[in-house]
């Protein structure tokens, strides 16, 4: 079924006129913009013929410099030149301080706890720095295509959380760009290869960029790109290779590790140059100041082996999550400039048992795929029909239930966009409000998951416990942003929230959440069962105590009351321990000894309801 294209007044396109839309790869090290031209998706070059724009921004007192010239000034003006700003997107001030010496900037905080970089132009947020990069790409596209853009598809790592995705959208808005969609980088690569080769089957997208690593397992069938599983590391990339070589230089040259920002930047530039030279050479001369030495590819491979191994571990986990075997994967697509490193390609080939695909420039493939999707979303028809993309969420979403348990509403690796609803009820008689605690993670207890947001549903009509019906709906849009609503179905009272955390996960937390869920799976199940038994026991105790207070003296003799009190006391004591089986059995015993009491209360209620009524009135009830 075709979608109606609705435009704002004055923006409707002329018949047969293409709407100008682009795909943007906003990368850690480099950025690109691409568009469909004459039926082919291709990157757009600047006036000098360069398609790659270094993600470098230098601030002068009266102007902003972006790209190659800014990158070259990184050593001479390190405090005003910002590199790898993508690593700061959606982060808090405390997060970036943990990176320490890796970031040679002066950070200042604000009321929002967002990190600001102190420059000659004043404090600059990561969103503002990213916006300056996006402005240059927008201007390049409009100059090349000869018109104003209707929008852009901007790619983000699959592991970007809500805060990082929202920060990317904010940067685009600041740059004057209408975001048609945020697209996961691995999915964009699949679009590029799927269109060109009409591939069907299982494909692994190995994306190693400057600052992030993503692995995705996709099923390609008849134009449908379905992401079966994602994984990766939000703090692994070519920058880490540079730091490994820089560490080798410091050790080999007997340098002090406490370098000033300019020296640190020069050191990293020397390391990066050596890394790039070793792509085509077996050895390279590394020079830093008066010191010189030969770095062989073999020695470089040894330096980066732990990082390569980390990436392959994430690959194996993603394959396992997707429910397939390594041998089922028929193609491996390489994305990101860091996949040019020979050892990376060798290791991937060894792990998957086949040579990876590198037919499309790994630096350009993401932007090329994004441009294809942008053209479709802009309403331009393409030969071959529509293209359907099915992204997934990387971490489960849910909410807190009684006992501090995490109830998953949308499991990880669920295709997005998605909406899921689940019904809950009240725990206590007369409960008029419910606290909704939204969580993210894979563990069973809320203490082991990440808190995303809290809100309250008020105005629930007074009822006995369990009578109210509250429907909680989770909606994740195509950009991975979450909104949660809660509605009491009887009265219609409703409350909702859009989850936009003030800052994202710290480096390593995303991978750690998945790792911990695997390591503690059995313990978590045992803990969950215990909590559920404790909650059931507490609910029964409260119900029994309420009944005793209301009708105990009237309906029970002294011996019956003593038996029930003893059973309540024993269950209360057992709940303090960790013997789930004993709690379960004692809960059953308490339920059994109170059966007769419950029956008497029911009889009394029925008698009271029928008292004073005639037969016709009773039949009408």
Curated annotation (Swiss-Prot):
UniProt xrefs under SUPFAM superfamilies:
Actin-like ATPase domain, Heat shock protein 70kD (HSP70), C-terminal subdomain, Heat shock protein 70kD (HSP70), peptide-binding domain
The UniProt entry's GO biological process terms, in alphabetical order, are: iron-sulfur cluster assembly
> Which keywords belong to this entry?
ATP-binding, Chaperone, Nucleotide-binding
Checking InterPro entries in the record gives: ATPase_NBD, Heat_shock_70_CS, HscA_NBD, HSP70_C_sf, HSP70_peptide-bd_sf, Hsp_70_fam, ISC_FeS_clus_asmbl_HscA
The molecular function terms of the Gene Ontology recorded here are: ATP binding; ATP hydrolysis activity; ATP-dependent protein folding chaperone; unfolded protein binding
**One Pfam family this sequence matches:** HSP70
Domain of life where this protein originates: Bacteria
- Does the record carry Nucleotide-binding as a key word? yes
**Has UniProt tagged this entry with the keyword Nucleotide-binding?**
yes
Q: What does this protein do?
A: Chaperone involved in the maturation of iron-sulfur cluster-containing proteins. Has a low intrinsic ATPase activity which is markedly stimulated by HscB.
Note the HAMAP family from the entry: HscA
Can you tell me which family this protein belongs to?
Answer: Belongs to the heat shock protein 70 family.
What protein name applies here?
Answer: Chaperone protein HscA homolog
Q: Which gene encodes it?
A: hscA
